């Protein structure tokens, strides 16, 4: 599927509305837009981690796959489930259970060799770890926004992007620990 952007501004949103992928127009304050904007921000936070954190190639590959998935999540959130507009050139992009299963596999792969935690982890340590913690917290907000959109638009917004974001924040936590190579910065209660 090719995407061609010939012009960035359109002026169609200057009245406070924007178009969903089914060509309907909604207020820019619609919770679906909040959710996919938060996915976009999560994607940007991951991009900063990639640019400044110097991850190894395996983690880079994982994070770049996630960045692609986050675009799919945004497309899913902007496409009503009962969308009747079908264009074979532009198939609907949906988060599926396969996306979630892949995140769970990565969680298991990267978490298994880590030492057991005896306290909560403070964001920090290496630059990559700190940046992944920022991405994790943005992903948590995106998840809350996605659940709010599901609740506000029952039967219209899929729950799978919210589930994906839930698992994504878990993976980002695990990867932040991997980035600290076993030297987690631990919370000292009352410390």
Curated annotation (Swiss-Prot):
Pfam families, alphabetized: Cob_adeno_trans
Pathway(s) per entry: Cofactor biosynthesis; adenosylcobalamin biosynthesis; adenosylcobalamin from cob(II)yrinate a,c-diamide: step 2/7
Any single GO CC term annotated in Swiss-Prot or TrEMBL for this entry: cytoplasm
Highest taxon of source: Bacteria
Example GO biological process: porphyrin-containing compound biosynthetic process
InterPro entries: CblAdoTrfase-like, CblAdoTrfase-like_sf, PduO-typ
Main subcellular location of this protein, as a coarse class: cytoplasm
Location(s), subcellular: Cytoplasm
Identification of the protein by name: Corrinoid adenosyltransferase
Source species of the chain: Mycobacterium leprae (strain TN)
